[in-house]
Amino acid sequence: MENMKPKIILTGDRPTGKLHVGHYAGSLKRRVELQNSGEYDKIFIMIADAQALTDNADNPAKIRDNIMEVALDYLSVGIDPAKSNIFIQSHVAELTELTFYYMNLVTVSRLQRNPTVKAEIQMRNFETSIPMGFFNYPISQAADITAFKATTVPVGEDQLPMLEQTKEIVHKFNSVYGETLVDPEILLPSNKACLRLPGIDGKAKMSKSLGNCIYLSESEADVKKKVMSMFTDPDHIRIEDPGKLEGNTVFTYLDAFSNEGHFAEYLPEYTNLDELKDHYKRGGLGDVKVKKFLNNVLQEELSPIRARRAGYEKNIEGVYEILKKGSEVAAETAAQTLSEVKAAMKINYFDDPAFLEEQIQKFNE
């Protein structure tokens, strides 16, 4: 019987700050489900510090300060180091060498057309002076994905162009040098509300600088305070006024987090979210009541995360060892892929006895 290709996941986050409920709804919760599904042979989770430096080169302390924060967030949401290999990107030198070889397979104009790159450049005001490392990061990402032979890459919809770039590099490499790299598939979130949660102020994106995030590590009191200050329908002034759902942050969060069990527990006069929405739209339902319900929903989700984090915070040496061992395993895996890439490109001169034989024959003729 023909051997099936191992199912391997690669995913990760930039350590530019603590992780928040947007990360949790958009990717972390799904990662834990995938990890525990038993469907995957290997899972690699990368703390992408080298990638974070592409737009934080003048502030490496920011990255250094958040390595452990992100690791603690991973462990607190249920990432299990016995099932998922957590590693630090900069400690896998093979990724840089792979990036260097892949750069020869992509044109500058192709990178410029990448919609994700264009959007990120605009967001960071890099239009006139784009750091080369930042401009190059779709190629770096292709190295990350292919180094671990990832078959599945769970990402948000906004990252689709990035994965398309990776697939193009894989196809180009394999067509030029022979079948070597694994062609990955994207795995999108199933719940559309999870694709990108807005900030609590209604802004399109949660951002540490805007102060509109709910962090996974925040206290119960701080979470409640932020929920009660959330942006809703500005025209819903009196309880009897009909309310709008579009752009109403509270309902966006309920879409992402609530289920019928929450209604039975905290708001039994409604069976499900559709009933609550209908009441809000026709009027007679106040924002405070809806916010209190959302607070209960979020506290139920975040309480075990806080408890696990408190335990890991008492054993930072243990977390350090998880990262160190994970990075060693990742480097071994990437080294094997790099060896195969160099063999395919025929630049493995000292590992290939045929090279010396060819040269001896050439110069003895």
Give the positions of each predicted feature:
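Generic N-terminal leader/processing signal
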Residues: 1-5, 147, 340
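N-terminal Rossmann-like or analogous alpha/beta NTP/dinucleotide-binding catalytic cores
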Residues: 2-143, 261, 300-302, 306, ...
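Pocket-edge structural micro-motifs
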Residues: 11-13, 88, 149, 199, ...
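A broad detector of the eukaryotic-type serine/threonine protein kinase catalytic domain
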Residues: 14, 51-52, 148-153, 211, ...
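Structured ligand/cofactor/substrate-binding pocket environments in proteins
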Residues: 19-28, 43-44, 49, 58-63, ...
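Residue-level "edge-of-site" marker
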Residues: 87, 153, 355
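Conserved nucleotide- and phosphate/pyrophosphate-binding catalytic cores
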Residues: 161, 167-365
